[in-house]
Amino acid sequence: MRVVHLITTLAIGGAEQMLVKLLRAMDRSEFEPTVVTLVNDGALIEVIRDMGIEVRSLDLRRGEVSTRALRRLITILRAARPDVVQSWMYHANVAASMARPWLPRRTGVAWNIRQSLYDISKERFLTQAVIRSGRLLAPHVDALVNNSRVSREQHARIGYVNMRSLVIPNGFEVDSFRPDPAARASFRSELGLDDDAVLVGVVARVHPSKDHANFLRAAELAAARDPRLVFLCAGRGTDSHGRCREALRGPLRGRLRLLGERVDVPRVMAGLDMLVSSSKTEGCPNAVGEGMACGLPVIGTDIGDTRDVIADAGRVVPCGDASALAAEIAALSALGHARRREIGDAARERIRMAYSIESVASRYGRLYHDIISERRGSGRLVSQLEPMPARPAEAAL
């Protein structure tokens, strides 16, 4: 079965890393993947190519809307002859549907929505427009995949309605993300930490939705309670972001490490004593599951399906409540290493049993087979969408 994955970019982020994990986990003797990006950038391009998977790009600039790129997408998809086009995130979802009328009727299209949506006005202007246009297109795709129950409910309320709307959560590589004493020792040595330090980390790119500011406010409050606490921010932009840099000169001076983007995330997490997710909007946070798989106590904000993932194996605090977050950080620190390890062991077991990448990949595989069976067996006609390219597709190709 040929599957084309269409995604905005392959910079390191939650959706992009989930795609990489899915590509690793799916049976290559059964599924033949190709990846197409809207924007030609990102550290994960070479990671995917090293897996022997072709990566192509429409070479769009960020924020650009281009009929030329749509014609190029149609050309690529026709040449690839996919059985299923799996798109990832709003922009790629809309692009897949815009190309759909020029593909064979047997080709299925599945959207993947990767975030919750609490307030559309907080999104960039172009993203707002793309989300709104998605309401018109969503009923006509073959499947609407959300990575959280909350996301599905929120998008349904604004008009994302589809007969096959389902939740497939993020999956986690428990063999890669695991407790690793050697990695813990080497990473903490790199940071110059002694054995008594309690290292609390956020692993997330800088974006308003990740709310690093709330984490830093909580860190300042918790640091005043416990002198052993040391804090860490890892992820794209954390080493240059103004609020993060400012914190280096404030109450967290000498107790905050800003690492920027890291490719050795399992090693970073192995060195932590607890992980925090301070996000304001998420679907099913990758960092939460990865931290739990590493055997860490995790504190997450009550957004998306974070509460469902953590369950009894961590702590959940109200979104944006720095005082509550600080209190939980201080409380976990006070428990001591042995008790934190017990909580972390329970967290890892929960991920292993309920959120392994193997089980998630199996669900995607079944979905693709269902789509193909329906398209080839029912004779269902593709919805008639308004032509988008500036000239007829055949002339463009």
Residue ranges with predicted function:
Residues 139-167, 172-176:
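A short, active-site helix/loop in glycosyltransferases that binds the activated sugar's phosphate group
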Residues 37, 297-300:
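Short hydrophobic beta-strand element within catalytic cores of glycosyltransferases
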Residues 42-50, 225, 230-255:
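Short, structured helix-loop element that forms part of the nucleotide-activated donor/catalytic region
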Residues 189, 339-354, 363-366:
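A short, well-ordered alpha-helix in the C-terminal region of glycosyltransferases
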Residues 13-24, 198, 202-221, 231, ...:
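A conserved mid-protein helix/loop that constitutes part of the nucleotide-sugar donor-binding site
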Residues 87-95, 113:
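Short His-centered aromatic/hydrophobic patch
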Residues 261, 280:
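Aromatic "clamp/platform" in nucleotide-sugar-dependent glycosyltransferases that forms part
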Residues 315-322, 331-337:
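Conserved acidic donor-binding segment of nucleotide-sugar-dependent glycosyltransferases
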